[in-house]
Amino acid sequence: LKYKQKQVIDNLTRIGKIQMEEVLPILGSEHTQFYRNKLEFTFSNKKWLTEEQVQSGESFDCMNGVGFHIPGMFDKVLDIHKCWLQDDISNRIRLAIKDYCLTHEGYPFFDLRNQEGFIRTLMIRTASTGDLMVVVVFFHEDKERREALLSYVAEQFPEITSLQYVINGKCNDTITDQEILVYKGKDHIIEEMEGLKFKVGPKSFYQTNSAQAYNLYKIARSFAQLTGNELVYDLYTGTGTIANFVSR
């Protein structure tokens, strides 16, 4: 946080030519593990190998992996066994889907370089209300195998309140222009903040650290010193959390 603050101050003073007499310290998040409410994982048939693994000479029969992209290597992912960023339910869902695809015929992990495969990406959203959203993205339609996988997920994790899927045959992984279909449950989850309830869908922008967003909004509202007679514009809004929050 110290170096992040230094960078911000440098950008404002050296580049922006803004004179600043005092800069308050960054208020760090109390929680540094399991704090995210949204994660996206990529299925790849080319998992990243460490330098030690490459030098070992060991033969890796299965190169399938589910995890995050390696910087500078668009077609490789870091195969994650335990992610410390989101509630543990996220780990259990990801590993269950991975295991199902590896042990059942017809679920090849996506080849990003050659644009081949079936199972592509996975999005998991959690909420403080207990709602849970899972979105599975496939490269092409295979109704029998798609329904088999989604039914398995629904049966194994009844706590999922929104189970959805996407057929994305494009070269890139973005789903903002894709139709998202509901397999079971609702098309959204509900997040709550200070009595306000927000509908969050697969394409919604909502601060990924709910607890820290609440702290941020409280401080911003305090700094604004609103009396109730002002007109506030939320010019770069996502889900509308800030506008609704300060309106109280």
Regions found by a protein language model. Give the residues of each.
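Accessory RNA-recognition modules of RNA-modification enzymes
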Residues: 1-248
